[in-house]
Amino acid sequence: MAKLTKKQKEAVSKIEKNKLYSLKDASVLIKQIASAKFDESVDIAVKLGVDPRKANQMVRGVVALPHGTGKNMRVLALVTPDKEAEAKEAGADFVGLDDYLQKIKDGWTDVDVIVTMPAVMGKLGPLGRILGPRGLMPNPKTGTVTMEIGKAVTEIKAGKIDFKVDKTGIVHAGIGRISFDADKIMENAHEIIQTLIKLKPTAAKGTYIKSIHLTSTMSPAIALDPKAV
């Protein structure tokens, strides 16, 4: 393990060992221990009591963070010509179809989200091996395959994110920036936690939310009390 810097040691010392923090206290503390010279991302990791290998225990969905992510989401709209103006007006960063499909085939994936139309999905199939591992494949369940292209782009730009439990049963999500007020960090975290609770699979047994950790790009993780969120 790499040696901790002086600032990182100071940050660790401010976190009480074995303590489970309330979401409110953790949101204040995460700002106090941040030491980087850039605006760090604030992330949440929620360990769920599910077996994601089983289809009836897969947890995925979307959430509109009340205060956005603080990140400028780069959106590619893969649409037919009749939808291009709608996508551009909504703020899509890249708009088109065949030219961008070719760029992706050539290895270009410099975007955060891709939205498209049902009629175009057939063309994206062969690109699954490129887009899939990067989490960029559009999906009707997350609202990125739709005829309402303008609405989809607007929502993403406003802070709508999609999430999916990984193979270890953890949901990771970026929920803001360290420059956010503690209340905004808390409210964004609360929104995604409540969304996860609503999505609890009926097949999931035992404790559903096993642990929650709040962290920033360069800081150690703060353990939250799942009962105090």
Curated annotation (Swiss-Prot):
Top-level taxonomic group: Bacteria
Example of a GO MF term: tRNA binding
Organism the protein comes from: Flavobacterium psychrophilum (strain ATCC 49511 / DSM 21280 / CIP 103535 / JIP02/86)
Cell membrane in keyword set: no
Keyword Cytoplasm: no
Subunit structure, interactors included: Part of the 50S ribosomal subunit.
CC terms in the record's Gene Ontology section: large ribosomal subunit
Classification lineage: Bacteria, Pseudomonadati, Bacteroidota, Flavobacteriia, Flavobacteriales
Described function: Binds directly to 23S rRNA. The L1 stalk is quite mobile in the ribosome, and is involved in E site tRNA release. Protein L1 is also a translational repressor protein, it controls the translation of the L11 operon by binding to its mRNA.
Gene3D superfamilies named among the record's database cross-references: 3.30.190.20, 3.40.50.790
Keywords, alphabetical: Repressor, Ribonucleoprotein, Ribosomal protein, RNA-binding, rRNA-binding, Translation regulation, tRNA-binding
Protein's recorded name: Large ribosomal subunit protein uL1
Annotated family: Belongs to the universal ribosomal protein uL1 family.
Annotated gene: rplA
A GO BP annotation: translation
InterPro entries listed in its UniProt record: Ribosom_uL1_bac-type, Ribosomal_uL1, Ribosomal_uL1-like, Ribosomal_uL1/biogenesis, Ribosomal_uL1_3-a/b-sand, Ribosomal_uL1_CS
